[in-house]
Amino acid sequence: MNLILKFRRSFRTLIVLLATFCLVSILISAYFLYSGYKQEMTLIETTAEAECADIKDLPYRSIELRTIKPIDTSKTDPTVLLFVESQYSQLGQDIIAILESSRFQYQMVIAPGKGDIPPLTDSGKGKYTLIIYENILKYVSMDSWNRELLEKYCIEYSVSIIGFHKANENSLPTTQLKGFPLNLFNNVALKDCSVNPQSPLLHITKGPKVEKGPLPGEDWTIFQYNHSTYQPVLLTELQSEKSLSFLSSQTLYATIIQDLGLHDGIQRVLFGNNLNFWLHKLIFIDAISFLSGKRLTLSLDRYILVDIDDIFVGKEGTRMNVKDVKALLETQNLLRTQVANFTFNLGFSGKFYHTGTEEEDEGDDLLLRSVDEFWWFPHMWSHMQPHLFHNESSLVEQMILNKEFALEHGIPINLGYAVAPHHSGVYPVHIQLYAAWKKVWGIQVTSTEEYPHLKPARYRKGFIHNSIMVLPRQTCGLFTHTIFYKEYPGGPQELDKSIKGGELFLTILLNPISIFMTHLSNYGNDRLGLYTFVNLANFVHSWTNLKLQTLPPVQLAHKYFELFPEQKDPLWQNPCDDKRHKDIWSREKTCDHLPKFLVIGPQKTGTTALYLFLLMHPSIISNLPSPKTFEEVQFFNGNNYHKGIEWYMDFFPTPSNITSDFLFEKSANYFHSEEAPKRAASLVPKAKIITILIDPSDRAYSWYQHQRSHEDPAALRFNFYEVITTGHWAPPDLKTLQRRCLVPGWYAVHIERWLAYFSTSQLLIIDGQQLRSDPATVMDEVQKFLGVTPHYNYSEALTFDPQKGFWCQLLEGGKTKCLGKSKGRKYPPMDSESRTFLSSYYRDHNVELSKLLHRLGQPLPSWLRQELQKVR
C-alpha cells in the first residue's frame, strides 16, 4: 500500500516537473522567436542614403558573402521545365517570351494542383537544368511525395528553381512559405528600387543604381528571413507605412531574393511580383544564367546598326536642314563614346535630291559634303517597291540611275548592303530583285522585318538566298510620321518607357545583333532619332554590363550567321497566309499553284502505281514533269528548295476550280528526308500526306535491284548481303548504297517525324500489299481521305493484266494502260541469309511501327503481323 502511495506522489511530482519544463521552454522559445523577429526587422533597417554604399556596410546580416556550391551542368540537358498556371496566363506568356527570345529550350507544363509531375530523367540523365514556377505556391503546396521527388532530383542533378509570387486580393497580409524560414508580406506599394551589387547572380545587370519613383502596382510582395541562405537581389522602400503598419517606411526590403542553397541544398531565386517591372526581366535573365551554371546565358556583346532610310526622300518640312545634319554628325561622335565604331548607315534614293525647301536642300548638300563620315546603302532610285517591277531589266534600270547618282556625288558603292523600300521583294522573295541587286551593286547583305513574320518580333530570323544574306530588322518605334516629341503616339511617355526598360531596351537586351530601321524624317524637326539612341545608349550603359558596338553590314552578316548557322536555310511560307506578305508580293503571282496533298513515298513501295491511279480521277491533277526527275519535283528534300516557291509553283497548272480540283505531287524521297516534313508544313500546312508501307526487307531488296538495273557501280560490285551487312570500313559509295537500302525502312522513325508537323488526321498510311492486290478498295479509301468529288469507280476502271502481273487502267475498246517496262521487273528471290539478317535488323523498328499504328487506330498490314510473330 505504501509503495502505491509513494508511486502516486512521485508520478504527480513528475507531472509537475514536466509541466514546469514545458512552460519554461515555451517562454524561452517565445523570447528568442520574438527577439529574432525584432532582430530581423532591425537587420534590414537602413535609409535610402545608404543605397549606393558598399553592400557589405549595409546592416543585412544575410548579405555576408558565403560560399555557394558550384552547379554541375554535366548531369542535365540544357532545357528549362516551366510550370505555368494555364496555357494562356500572362506571366507564363511573359516567361515564354523571354525564353524564346533568348533561344533557350524549354518544356511548358500546367502546374499540377494534384497528381504527378512529368518525368525528370531519361536514361540516367536529367532532362532539365532549371525549373521555373509561375506560381511558387504551387511548388510549396505540392503533396509530400511529388515534392520529395522534385527536390531529390534538384539535389542529385544540381538543378535550381526560380519562382514567382504574385499577390492578389485574397492574399493574406503576411504568409510563411511552407517549409522555408521565410516570411512574405503581400500587397505592398513600393518605390525606389536598387540592385544589390554584391549579388553573385548578376551578369548583365549592373549595380548599384536606383530606379527612382513608385513601382508599378500596389500588389508587391517583400521577403523577410532569418537564415544565412538568403540574400537580397533587389531592394525597395515602402511608399508609405499604410501598407503594413508594423513595417517601417525608413527600411529597405527585398522584392527578389536568392536562396544560396544553405538551407536544403537547392538554390532558388524568388520574385515578389511578375515580370511587368523591367528590372525584374533583367534580373530574371541573370537568374537563368547563374542557376543554369551559365549554360543558358546571353553574351555581353551587342552589335547594333542604325539605318536611316529615305535619305533625300520626304515632303517639305519633314527633311533635314543644315543644323540637323550638324547635329547628326555631333551625335554620331557622342554615341561613339558608348557604342564602339558607331556609324549611321544612310540609305538614299537619288531621284529626290534637292526636292525640299531651300534650307532642306542645303542640308542635302551638307550630307554629301560629309559623305565620308557615314556608311551608305542604296534604296531604289524612285523609292518604288521592287515587287511592282515584273521583269529584271526594269529593276536594273532603276538601280543604274541610283548608282550613277552615287558615283557623281562620291557616295561609296561597294559596301555590299541594300534595303528595299517597305522591304518589298526581300521576303516573300522577288527573284528579279535579288538578281538585279547582284548584277548592279554586288549586294551581299540585306535586311527585312518580314521574315518569317513581322510579329511577334522575337521570331524574326535571317536566311540566305541566292548568296545574299538576309538579316532580321528591328523597329524602334520611329516611323516616317514620328516627327515631334509631344505628338508621339500615346504621348511622349510611351517613347521614354520604350527606351527605359521597355520594348526598345528589351530588343537590345535579347538580341545579340539588332539592325534598327529609322527614316530621314526622324532626324529633322525634334530629331527623335537622335533623342532615342542617345538615351538608349545611356540607359544601357547605366543599368547593364552590355558592350555596345557597330560593325559594317557585311561583317555584321557574317557575325550573325556565325552565331546562328542553323538559320542559313530559309523556310518558305505561303505568301497569301499573311496579309503583309501578300501586299508586297507581285499581283501577277497566285497562291493557287500549291498542292493539296503529297505522296511522300518511300521509294519502291508502289508510289508510281498510286500516282497513275490518282491521275485517273477527273478532279485530281499532278505537277508537270521535271526534265531531270521526271514525274517527281523533289522540292522539299534537296537543293531545289533553294530555288524558291515560284520555281516550285511553276510545276503546277492553274486549276479550273480551286475548290474542287486537287493538285498533288509525288516525290518518294520525301518520306525519309529530315528536312521535308518541316519545309512542307511551312509552305502547305493544310496539305494531306499519303505514304505506302511494304515489308522493309522487300523494299531494301527492291532498291538494290533497282540500282543494279541503273548500273550503280557499288550495286554491280557487291551482292545484296554484302551491301546490307557492310561495316564502317566500307568505301563511301557502298556506305551510301547501304543507307539508301536500309534507312527508308525505319518506318516508325520517319512517320513520327512527319507527325511532328502534321496532325494524324492529315496522314494516310496505305498497305502496299493491299494496293498491289486490291487497288480499287485502296483508292476508295484514298478518295474518302482526300474528300475529293465526284466519287470515281476504280472497280470498273482497273483490270488485272496477267502478263504484267499488276493492275492497269482499262481504256475504251478493252485496251489497257499500264506502268512502263521499268516497273514490275522480275528479280531473283532474296537469299535466305539476307532475309534472316533483315528480319533481325528491322525487328525493333517493326515493333515501334506496330505501337505507332495502334496509337493511330490503324490496322496492322499482313506483312507486319507476320514479322511480329517471328519476334515471339
Swiss-Prot record:
Disulphide-bridged cysteine pairs: C808-C818
One GO MF term: heparan sulfate N-sulfotransferase activity
Keywords: Disulfide bond, Glycoprotein, Golgi apparatus, Hydrolase, Membrane, Multifunctional enzyme, Signal-anchor, Transferase, Transmembrane, Transmembrane helix
Record's signal peptide: none
Compartment annotation: Golgi apparatus membrane
Record flagged with keyword Glycoprotein: yes
Active-site residue list: K604
Ranges per topology, Cytoplasmic: 1-13
Subunit and interaction comment: Monomer.
Record-linked InterPro entries: Heparan_SO4_deacetylase_dom, HSNSD_N, NST/OST, P-loop_NTPase, Sulfotransferase_dom
Glycosylation sites: N226, N341, N391, N657, N793
Residues at which 3'-phosphoadenylyl sulfate binds: K604, T605, G606, T607, T608, S702, K823, G824, R825, K826, Y827
Protein name (record): Bifunctional heparan sulfate N-deacetylase/N-sulfotransferase 4
Pfam family, one: Sulfotransfer_1
GO biological process, alphabetically ordered: heparan sulfate proteoglycan biosynthetic process; heparin proteoglycan biosynthetic process
Family that this chain belongs to: Belongs to the sulfotransferase 1 family. NDST subfamily.
Bilayer topology: Single-pass type II membrane protein
Keyword Cell cycle: no
Any one of the GO CC terms: Golgi membrane
EC number: 2.8.2.8, 3.-.-.-, 2.8.2.-
Known pathway: Glycan metabolism; heparan sulfate biosynthesis; Glycan metabolism; heparin biosynthesis
Record region (Heparan sulfate N-sulfotransferase 4): 589-872
Protein role: Essential bifunctional enzyme that catalyzes both the N-deacetylation and the N-sulfation of glucosamine (GlcNAc) of the glycosaminoglycan in heparan sulfate. Modifies the GlcNAc-GlcA disaccharide repeating sugar backbone to make N-sulfated heparosan, a prerequisite substrate for later modifications in heparin biosynthesis. Has low deacetylase activity but high sulfotransferase activity.
Tissue note: Expressed at low level in brain and throughout embryogenesis. Not expressed in other tissues.
Catalyzed reactions per annotation: alpha-D-glucosaminyl-[heparan sulfate](n) + 3'-phosphoadenylyl sulfate = N-sulfo-alpha-D-glucosaminyl-[heparan sulfate](n) + adenosine 3',5'-bisphosphate + 2 H(+)
Annotated segments matching region Heparan sulfate N-deacetylase 4: 36-588
